[in-house]
Regions:
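Extracytoplasmic ligand-binding site segments that recognize negatively charged/polar headgroups
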Residues: 27, 40-54, 66-84, 89-221
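A bilobed periplasmic-binding-protein/Venus flytrap-type ligand-binding module shared by bacterial periplasmic
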Residues: 141-148, 184-186, 254-266, 285-286
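Bacterial N-terminal signal peptides
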Residues: 8-21
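A ligand-binding cleft/hinge motif common to bilobed small-molecule-binding domains
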Residues: 98-103, 223-242
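Periplasmic-binding protein-like
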Residues: 123, 137-138, 166-175, 196-200, 205-207, 277-299, ...
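Short amphipathic alpha-helical coupling segments at ligand-binding clamshell hinges
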Residues: 53, 191, 195-198, 256, ...
Length: 336
């Protein structure tokens, strides 16, 4: 019925994570990092995920205090810029989404760090000059309510969503700019913009937040959503909600770059933390949190999850013209 299989419900038990001698890579930094005694991590991951990662690092390196600050992409960017203007950066490591990682790199706010773990990450999932590496990627899917959508009406392509049966029955995120740009990049500009305009004519329901959209689909407020992630629906399905999802080609893919602050207060601790996040054990933790790790020797769960999927990433050229695409999105979907 769909391209991917569902991931099983996750259970992360911190005390059962056994760390192997991967840390030999980090020996160069450990003494200096422990002397610094602290690392500050800015992230857009949800609080429970951030805590699982930082608690695991703290267990491995008890002499280093780990502090994390979780917020949205735009709020985090503003905080980083405010600190930079004041000449008092407080953060060491950042984990954000693709566009904001691009902005941080472009504005000179990231330091190059060629972690020894980066060799396990493919081109396209890391900056060629070492400024960031993506720790995991989230993939967009079409999620729907199984009580409201008959099997015959389950979409097999984006074009299927332009049929009369879907008019007024699709939810999209009110500021889904990366979904918009990645889908256009994947389809090709002319075809992509044509699809977006046709989708807007279907009178989609605009809401704030991918998790909320999935919840509204489960509640039957509308039949499906095009801008949520796989894990949004897996979580609901595990709780018994009448939902399912399919991957439509191209599937929006959002990298999650990890990078070191250009003026890190604790640079050695920051490097050690990045090594940990990119290590196989760190990536196994990412996988246990129902995310799809980007490290090549750490397959998703199940390993066949991405078979047949055509990912679409926003191109650097589009990022360079991102403001214009935001205006296009607002114009096409009537967002003020």
């Amino acid at each position: 019925m769909r391209n991917w299989q569902l991931m099983p419900a996750w259970a992360f038990i911190l005390g059962c994570v056994c760390f192997s001698p991967w840390a030999s890579f980090a020996a160069e930094w450990q003494d200096k990092a422990e002397a610094e005694g602290k690392v500050v991590f800015y992230t857009t991951a949800n609080t429970s995920d951030a805590k699982a990662i930082t608690d695991s690092f703290k267990k491995l390196y008890p002499k280093i205090d780990v502090q994390f600050d979780r917020t949205t992409d735009s709020q985090m960017m503003e905080k980083i810029l405010t600190e930079a203007r004041a000449g008092k950066p407080l953060w060491d490591v950042v984990s954000t989404t693709g566009f904001y990682g691009y902005l941080l790199r472009k504005r000179g706010l990231l330091a190059a760090y060629d972690s020894p773990e980066r060799k396990y990450f493919r081109a396209g999932f890391k900056d060629s000059q070492g400024f960031w590496t993506s720790s995991y990627t989230t993939y967009g899917i079409f999620g729907f309510n199984t009580k409201l959508v008959a099997k015959a009406n389950i979409p097999r392509s984006h074009e299927d969503l332009l049929k009369p049966a879907w008019k007024g029955q699709i939810g999209i995120e009110g500021r889904a700019y990366e979904w918009f740009t990645a889908t256009i990049s994947g389809m090709g500009k002319e075809q992509g913009l044509s699809f977006m305009r046709a989708l807007a004519a279907q009178r989609p329901n605009l809401r704030g937040g991918r998790t909320l959209l999935a919840q509204l689909v489960a509640a039957g407020e509308f039949n499906g959503t095009l801008t949520s992630y796989m894990h949004n629906f897996d979580t609901l399905k595990a709780s018994g909600a009448p939902v399912e999802w399919v991957a439509l080609a191209p599937s929006f893919a959002n990298l999650h770059p990890v990078g070191l602050a250009a003026k890190s207060p604790h640079p050695n601790a920051g490097k050690l933390f990045i090594d940990f996040m990119l290590s196989q054990k760190g990536q196994e933790i990412v996988r246990s949190l129902k995310r799809i790790p980007d490290r090549t020797d750490t397959p998703p769960d199940p390993p066949t999850l991405l078979q047949g999927v055509t990912p679409a990433f926003t191109s650097p050229e589009v990022y360079d013209d991102f403001d214009r695409y935001i205006k296009l999105y607002q114009e096409i979907f009537g967002v003020k």
